[in-house]
């Protein structure tokens, strides 16, 4: 079952066509990464899905509803973590979550959400005294307090230290385990590679690649094989690394040589992203 269906989506601002007829679906319970450089159309697309911006053309269904015609009950099923915070500085972490819980008919327990986002030791600290990364964790908690079915996460780990990022990743994985659907936008390509079941790469308002991260890295960029032979450093690039490694090993065995310093450097999602978004 699809949580999000987009067909032929278009949006222009005057003469600038920000989104140019894109199509994609997000399955229920999936983490979907929407990637692309600034100005690619990500924000416009997400705001249309959230119901905050009207489209010019195309079909959009989110949880079975056109966001432009959505009811308050539909909005309760949507959680949004914005890139910029709008927190109450004089409230504590727990007070903040209780305030936002009051906007929903069936919210999650605020103390449970505090633990979920790793702020247990900060639950009684005022927002203004939190670090930037801790405030982002509170933003994530606010996005989850209504127990939504679909969560939009816009750059969710900006400002996090490495440990906090790993904690946030585990939280997002737990959401998937609970059957929640997540749309993730991020500039951290390792984050998308770790979390997303599928990704779509936007450039100039069109989707230039879509698929599982492992599929995207499977053949679009050549694998690099490095080794030393007779003191000479050798670098080879191939789209069939398994076959080439077999050939190199057979050649070395036949000659009684060692393949010193052998390394196989497979393309990452970042390599694919840079190739696809290059001007």
What residue spans do the PLM features occupy?
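Short, charged/small-residue-rich alpha-helical element at the C-terminal edge
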Residues: 215-279
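Extreme N-terminus of proteins, especially the signal/transit-peptide cleavage junction
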Residues: 1-2, 216
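A general boundary/transition motif marking the beginning of the first structured unit of a protein
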Residues: 1, 88, 101-102, 236-237, ...
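Charged, amphipathic alpha-helical segments
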Residues: 208-216
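ABC transporter nucleotide-binding domains
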Residues: 4-6, 11-184, 189-203, 209
């Amino acid at each position: 079952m699809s949580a999000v269906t987009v067909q032929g989506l278009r949006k222009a601002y005057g003469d600038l066509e920000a989104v140019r007829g894109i199509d994609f679906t997000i399955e229920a319970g999936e983490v979907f990464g929407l990637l692309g450089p600034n100005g690619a159309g990500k924000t416009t697309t997400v705001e249309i899905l959230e119901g905050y911006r009207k489209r010019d053309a195309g079909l959009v269904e989110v949880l079975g509803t056109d966001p432009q015609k959505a009811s308050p009950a539909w909005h309760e099923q949507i959680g949004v973590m914005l890139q910029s915070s709008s927190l109450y500085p004089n409230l504590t972490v727990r007070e903040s979550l209780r305030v936002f819980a009051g906007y929903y008919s069936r919210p999650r327990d605020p103390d449970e959400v505090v633990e979920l986002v790793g702020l247990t030791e900060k639950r009684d600290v005022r927002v203004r005294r939190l670090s930037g990364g801790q405030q982002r964790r509170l933003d994530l908690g606010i996005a989850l307090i209504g127990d939504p079915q679909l969560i939009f996460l816009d750059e969710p780990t900006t400002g996090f230290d490495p440990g906090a990022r790993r904690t946030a990743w585990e939280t997002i994985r737990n959401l998937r385990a609970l059957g929640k659907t997540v749309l993730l936008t991020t500039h951290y390509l390792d984050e998308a590679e770790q979390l997303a079941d599928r990704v779509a790469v936007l450039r100039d308002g069109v989707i230039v690649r879509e698929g599982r991260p492992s599929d995207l890295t499977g053949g679009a960029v050549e694998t690099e094989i490095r080794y030393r032979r007779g003191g000479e450093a050798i670098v080879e690039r191939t789209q069939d690394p398994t076959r080439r490694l077999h050939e190199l090993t057979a050649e070395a065995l036949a000659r009684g040589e060692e393949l010193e310093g052998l390394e196989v450097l497979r393309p990452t999602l970042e390599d694919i992203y840079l190739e696809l978004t290059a001007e």
